[in-house]
């Protein structure tokens, strides 16, 4: 869906910017142009950023202790 009509930015483009390394709304704004014209989309854009970052964080695997084998040289 379109989040920013002024710049033609979709929620998928915002998510893609995060998947490509953006870690904040500010970085997404700089990468996509979302929220740089009238600003009415900023709240929704921030929500998409927040939800996507939370989804990524919860999807990160947590390493279990004792599962890594070290080989002595």
Swiss-Prot record:
Binding note for cofactor: A phosphate ion (or another anion) stabilizes the protein fold and the [2Fe-2S] cluster.
Impact after mutating residue 29 to E: Probably unstable, it cannot be overexpressed, in truncated protein
Induction pattern: Increased transcription under iron starvation.
Family to which the UniProt record says this protein belongs: Belongs to the Bfd family.
UniProt xrefs under PANTHER family: BACTERIOFERRITIN-ASSOCIATED FERREDOXIN (PTHR37424:SF1)
Subunit-level organization: Monomer. Interacts with BfrB; up to 12 Bfd proteins can bind to the BfrB bacterioferritin complex (BFR). One Bfd protein binds to a BfrB dimer in the BFR, with the [2Fe-2S] cluster positioned about 22 Angstroms above the heme of BfrB. Does not interact with FtnA.
The protein's name in its UniProt record: Bacterioferritin-associated ferredoxin
Species assigned in the record: Pseudomonas aeruginosa (strain ATCC 15692 / DSM 22644 / CIP 104116 / JCM 14847 / LMG 12228 / 1C / PRS 101 / PAO1)
């Amino acid at each position: 869906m379109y989040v920013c009509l002024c710049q033609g930015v979709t929620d998928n483009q915002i998510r893609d910017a995060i998947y490509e390394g953006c870690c904040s709304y500010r970085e997404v704004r700089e990468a996509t142009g979302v929220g740089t014209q009238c600003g009415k989309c900023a709240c929704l854009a921030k929500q998409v950023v927040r939800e996507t970052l939370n989804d990524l964080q919860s999807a990160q695997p947590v390493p279990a202790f004792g599962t890594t084998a070290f080989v002595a040289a």
